[in-house]
Design a protein with these regions (language model features):
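Short, functionally important secondary-structure microenvironments
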Residues: 1-193
C-alpha cells in the first residue's frame, strides 16, 4: 500500500495525504487534500480496481475546484448531477495526461460491473433516468440506448472542459429531466381522459 500511496502522490503532483479505511468507495477531500481508499476483502479489491480508484481520485486532486460543493450549492444544483459530469471530465483529463491509465479505467470498471458495484445486475439499464445512464455510459456501459434529444447531453458530458461548463450542463440536464417527467405525467392524465 505504501507504493500505491507514493504513486498517488506522484500522479497528483503534490504531497496529498493518502489514507486507507473500511468504507464502500474511494474519495478525495479537496480541502483536506486527502485521498481515501477503501479496505475491502482481498478478493474484492483487485489491483485493477485499486488502480482505477487511485487514477479517478487523483483526477479530482488535479482538476476539481476546492469549492465545488459550495459553488453547486449556491446555484442550487443537485450534487449528484455535478459529480457525475465532473467525474466524466476529470477521468478524460487523467486519460489524456497519463495514457497508461486508459487500460486501468477499462479493466477496473469492467471488474466493478462484474461485481455489481453499481447495482445494475438483472436490471434494464436503458430504463434508468438520463443522468444515471450518462454515469454508466462513462463508466464503460456503451451498449445503452439514448433518444436523439438525450444524445446531445451525453456528448456534451464527454466534452466539458471547465467546472463552469459542468455546472451549466448539470442545470440543463436537471431541467430537461424535469420537463420530460412532466410530459410523461401529462400524457398519463391525457390517456385516462
Amino acid at each position: 500500500m505504501k507504493n500505491k500511496s507514493t504513486l498517488a502522490k506522484l500522479l497528483s503532483e503534490e504531497d496529498i495525504n493518502v489514507v486507507h479505511k473500511q468504507m464502500e468507495t474511494a474519495y478525495f477531500d479537496s480541502k483536506k487534500r486527502e485521498l481515501g481508499l477503501p479496505i475491502w476483502k482481498d478478493e474484492d479489491m483487485t489491483k485493477d480496481i485499486y488502480d482505477l480508484m487511485v487514477c479517478h481520485e487523483i483526477g479530482h486532486a488535479l482538476w476539481t475546484p476546492l469549492d465545488m460543493l459550495e459553488k453547486a450549492a449556491l446555484r442550487k444544483i443537485n450534487h449528484s448531477f455535478v459529480n457525475i459530469i465532473e467525474d466524466a471530465r476529470i477521468e478524460r483529463f487523467v486519460k489524456n495526461k497519463y495514457a497508461g491509465s486508459v487500460g486501468v479505467f477499462v479493466r477496473g470498471y469492467t471488474e466493478l460491473v462484474a461485481k455489481d458495484f453499481f447495482g445494475t445486475k438483472g436490471k434494464d439499464i436503458n430504463s434508468f433516468n438520463l443522468i444515471d445512464r450518462i454515469n454508466l455510459y462513462y463508466k464503460g456501459s456503451k451498449d445503452m440506448v439514448f433518444a436523439d434529444d438525450e444524445k446531445v447531453f451525453v456528448e456534451r458530458t464527454g466534452n466539458t472542459e471547465t467546472f463552469e461548463e459542468v455546472c451549466e450542463l448539470a442545470e440543463e440536464i436537471h431541467a430537461f429531466m424535469k420537463e420530460q417527467k412532466e410530459k410523461r405525467e401529462q400524457e398519463k392524465i391525457d390517456d385516462t381522459d
